[in-house]
């Protein structure tokens, strides 16, 4: 959150925190929680990650670079069924959808290209039919990270029964 304040100022950072329900966690001092909330408003899980408040880069020298709220709360019976990060925003049926890998990228990109609904799959390999079924009939552009263009182009063909995906090479 501090990085967003440094980047955009308090007002815009506050709007982003509210829009995406970004939270903090004491699991690691200053950690960020990216909640996965579906279109019904159901919280599927929370992904805990630690970022440098000055650079915004992930801190990767941790035992586990990603942790989950349901594990931190010690919920052994919890059944994980992930959805897109930002999926709750898809109640807006008008704007086209942009998919990126990282939650942080979705949040930041939403400021620069607000004509899209920005969502994230969480990693290069998490673009799949289960997460994308909610996109049926939508206009969707994929923005893979560096070196992900080929993989996501192939995935776009594989998932073409759901909707038409355009794959951008903007980040390539």
Q: Which residues make up each language-model segment?
A:
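Phosphate-handling DNA/RNA-contact segment within nucleic-acid enzymes
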Residues: 27, 33-138
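Replication-associated primase and helicase/ATPase modules
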Residues: 1-20, 35-40, 96-99, 111, ...
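Short, small/acidic-rich helices and loops at N termini and domain boundaries
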Residues: 21-22, 29-30
